[in-house]
Amino acid sequence: CTVERLMRANGWHGVTRTKKVRTTVADPQASRAADLVDRQFRVPAPNMLVVADFTYVRLVTGVFVYTAFVIDAFAGRIVGWECSASKHDRFVRSAIRQAAALRTAEGNPLSGNTIHHSDAGSQYTSVRFGETLSLSGLTPSIGSVGDAFDNALAETTIGLYKTEAVRADSPFRRGPLHRLADVELLTAEWVHWYNTSRLMHRLDRTPPIEFEAEHYAREVATQPGAHQ
């Protein structure tokens, strides 16, 4: 596809780092859930573990906007995302609600046993965020503050987003980023491509959504009476 050709032509293999903007700020008054993941992000099925984090995107005005992601650890599929002009917890809660609604619509709703893992940023330790997790069928798990290894899968996905979607020479950009809507558009297009077309090496060069579909097809095929 055009995106893949442009990526190869540009030789994109990593992120060119600029001055880091701090997005993870802990709330010293907030209670924190235990770390139920302990850096073990490989799971045998969807809906067992989702990871979450957010990053910043700089507009041409110098103002930052923020993009939050919810990622299923099984195939790395992005199941929820939201862009916001502020770092208030509303936008990370919205990403969670999107993930829950998507899984319900697909007939595979989140259960109370689904773990939601994030860092210890204040957005993810707020009371309202905890309520959103509970209502969405998720059990909280919290890593440390600002340690990339404690949330490595989310950090990796965000790195791909910054490289493949946000960079000035990205094929998903239609020009300078003037406003929040510009970031929302490029994010929507990148997420769709990432889920449906990006070949993932750890999935034997299969896109995330296809890898999930193959898993569910195997489940159906092994059910009693499936071949009757």
What residues fall within each predicted segment?
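Charged DNA-binding/catalytic regions of mobile-element recombinases
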Residues: C1-Q228
